[in-house]
Amino acid sequence: MNDLFKRIFVGAALSFAVVASPATDKKSGEWIQLFNGKNLDGWTPKIRYQELGKDPQKTFRVADGVIKVGYENYDEFKESFGHLFYQSPFSNYRLRVEYRFTGKQLKGGPGWARRNSGLMLHGQDPATMDKDQDFPNSIEVQLLGGFGEGKRTTLNLCTPGTDVEMKGKLLKRHCISSKSKTYHGEQWVTAEVEVRGSKYFKHIIDGKTVLEYQKPQRDDGTLLEGGSISLQSESHPCEFRKVELLPLK
């Protein structure tokens, strides 16, 4: 990440520190349906090499009551990573999604992106992303599907442009595996994340905490109090049938 981009992100993060609070003013105990099951109202795509809001190949669309992340209109991936951003930033909340992987990976997708997606949390404002930027600076809750045999955990952590602490130690490793089981095939998986501003994150699946860490921060050490939420497109088709959020005090 170059120095110019770091300066851009500092400004974006500071703006989130100001605007994240209003989105958490809704009553605690009431789940908000971020996805209404009908259309993408409240969501904005950012596809690499495209302007914000432009998704000419319809990577993100709604059909049969689910958000479909698909590549029917692509010939080849060509590193066109995409993210679907919710309209409001958040700081303290519990996020729940139901997701699954379908079909085959698009030609040209990187090997590591097979049956791979993510929830990008505490992210930068998409309006500050460069046109050719691949991922928003964020805390990524990595969603992975199994290959039919062997172990491949989900709800892992990746840190594009960020760092976290775990048990009092600053971690510089880009991705850290959770303790989840492996989910093969096209089964629906329910994933939850508890987020407490700059204090801690907990990844939860099947009622069990499979990963937790503290002090999400930018590469320069500035703590992240909140930010954007986005869903990822990384070359393998997937679906989200529920995206809901519970504000926490």
Where in this protein do the model-derived segments appear?
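Bacterial N-terminal signal peptides that target proteins for export
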Residues: 1-12
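Carbohydrate-interacting regions of secretory-pathway proteins
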Residues: 22-249
